[in-house]
Amino acid sequence: MEEANGVLSMGRIASGLIAAALVGCVAAARTETVKGELVDQACYIKDKKNVGGSHKDCAETCARRGQPLAVVTAGGKIYQITGPLAADNNTKLIPHLAHTVEITGDVSEKDGALMIAAEAGSLKMVGR
């Protein structure tokens, strides 16, 4: 019986170590306000010229299909928008495509990619 408990304890220890390692892959979220242009993330990553009014129709089509949208800062950082603000195929974000916005939310990083999880009321348009 003691040996069975020892195996069970080792299993619990191993499970705990695995869980801790997985948590370490995602940096802890911190609340920030991010300012930049609202873009269709996939198109922007393919070609940095896919911004502004000339790309707005394409970005809107992709956004309505549920493609991730992102804020691109003046320094070139890309923050994928997640959470309630991006719900319902980006409904709350679409009117602001190709505009400069500020979004406040929980910023995290996973495998080098930045994400901002934001509530529906956390977006502010600051420029066209």
Regions found by a protein language model. Give the residues of each.
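N-terminal secretory signal peptides that target proteins for export/translocation
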Residues: 1-10
